[in-house]
Amino acid sequence: MAELKGNKYGTHRVIEPKGVLTQAAWKVDNDMSKVYSNEIVCDVTSLNIDSASFTQISDACGGDEKKIGEMILGIVAERGKQQNPVTGSGGMFKGVVAHIGEDLKKKPGFDLKEGDKIVSLVSLSMTPLKIEKILSIHKDIDRVDIVGKAILFESALYAKMPEDMSEPLALAALDVAGAPAQARKLPKEGDSVLILGANGKVVGVVRNPKQVPGLLELGVYTDVIVADCTKPVEVMEAALAANDGKEYDLSICCVNIESCEMSAILPVHDDGLVYFFSMATSFTKAALGAEGIGKDVTMIIGNGYTKNHAQITLDVLRENPKLRKLFDEKYC
């Protein structure tokens, strides 16, 4: 019997409320026994939980791995997807293509086949997911190894696993592929750039002093300062001191905790750019905060997709051996 064709954006999987896309839905259909002709079914081996989401879950569970696993299983059982009800964010998965719908196989330019190893480039917050079993939880890198299945829709983005790097390395890089691809569009030659959450001049801000030597060794930072990004005055004073008292042209905030918006805005001069690439970012805090201090800055919310973002991100690792080594040591 021929497979039924679903909506290219996956709205046929929305259970409630009707009329929304899968990301905005409270609950989606994760029944893997019925597959549509324009869907891809994947055997999932790992989930990379969004950093803000994993931090919130871990804090709520007191860091207890068993409770973290139970909470993740509970979210997926209730909602049909891994979407943190507090942060609204998800993550992405690594897996193997198990089934491709009839219509997708006929689609011009379609480049997948059963057995291909892939990384999803769309959020788990919109991806139907079924978890059979949690195998292990890696709290230090926000990763959960599982036995499970996921559905990718016709419109979904994905990347084949590269052959020249390990799977954990590729997964870690592709998890935030939109950030480097977009960030490279923003600075101009001679700009002063402030990066918050760094885990002309490029200054990184971290909370842990132990991270400073490794970051400086990369050769991409002019300076790395130690400050708490939830304390904007502290960050501003340290950041300006590192830049000879001058305000910055661009700041990039990739911190995975709340209330860091003003630390990104305060050190930037009028007409400067502030780029938020964190699911912990609050539009209200950023907009009203900038208004309250009279800062005329352009604020950009990071989009997880930019054309060729997966290739750009992997090439960054290929071209920077020190950065690749840092990723290898942390994620592999």
Could you tell me what each predicted segment is?
Residues 33-48, 59-124:
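Glycine-rich beta-strand-centered segment in the early N-terminal region that forms part
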Residues 91, 118-192:
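NAD(P)H dinucleotide-binding glycine-rich loop of Rossmann-like/cofactor-binding domains
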Residues 101, 122-124, 128, 197, ...:
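Conserved "cap/hinge" positions at secondary-structure junctions
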Residues 165-225:
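Mid-domain Rossmann-like dinucleotide-binding core that forms the NAD(H)/NADP(H) cofactor-binding site
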Residues 183-189, 244-245, 266-267:
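Glycine-rich helix-loop-beta junction characteristic of Rossmann-like nucleotide cofactor-binding loops
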Residues 200-259:
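Adenosine-nucleotide cofactor-binding segment
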Residues 245, 315-332:
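C-terminal capping/lid region of NAD(P)-dependent oxidoreductase domains
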Residues 255-320:
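Glycine-rich phosphate-binding loop and adjacent beta-alpha segment
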